[in-house]
Amino acid sequence: METSPNSSDKLIREYDPNFQVTPEYRDSLPDVQNSGCAELDGARVPILQVGISGFRLPLCYVGPDGENLNIETAVTGTVSLDADKKGINMSRIIRIFYEYKNETFSPEIFARILREYKDRLDSKEARLKAQFSYPMMQESLRSGLQGFQFYDCCFEGIIDRADRIRKIIHFDFVYSSACPCASELSEHAREKRNLLAIPHSQRSKARISVEVHPDKEISLLELRDLCINGLQTETQVMLSLIHI
């Protein structure tokens, strides 16, 4: 649209508190995603993932004892973009997800959302991640005292061009291990100087990624128990100090 140099002087420069968005006005808004893009310049290059990263909201999850837990969650939703398309309406990533915000979340819910992303954003592939910190009550190794342990978790879902869906759970398990450097220095002190030296411990993280079979389920509690059985030295949430 051509404008004269002084046309901006005629534009309203004040906020209009009485303006109402009507259905007709909403329909008149430009929609680049669903409009023809022949008039838009740019290289015909596909993009593997485009979307919104880390929008936050509280979601409901099943707790370790079957109770409902509301947990703050960071969500990332992306779709693929074909070479003949110039973009997507980013807000639809959030708006579609918000239609499921009252569901009890699990990797199974992701399949429904991913299909909505493909259909309503007209994409060949879609990906979804939900990252959250999951609380579980844990008993200390020696004292018998209990406290909450928080586990960083991520539910990930992927749908491909053939509508095949992959469900992946990422689970972080923090445990105590002997520092290898301190261990070697301690052994050196014993051998060379006949000196008693004790290596210190350190926090270590095991990141477990499990792809769930389409016909199977696994809970975060089961994953936690598998980690405890494999690594017996989880960091402790409650200690009883003994004064000598």
Residue ranges: model-predicted function:
Residues 242-244:
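Conserved small/polar residues in nucleotide/adenosyl-binding loops
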Residues 138-207:
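Aromatic/basic-lined ligand-recognition segments
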Residues 229-236:
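A common structural junction motif
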Residues 56-63, 77-85, 132-136, 155-161, ...:
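Beta-strand elements of well-folded, non-transmembrane domains
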Residues 202-207, 223-227, 239-240:
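Long C-terminal interaction/binding lobes of large macromolecular proteins
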Residues 2-126:
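Hydrophobic, proline/glycine-rich low-complexity stretches
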Residues 100-136, 141-158:
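Basic, nucleic-acid-interacting segments
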Residues 214-224:
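Short, conserved charged micro-motifs
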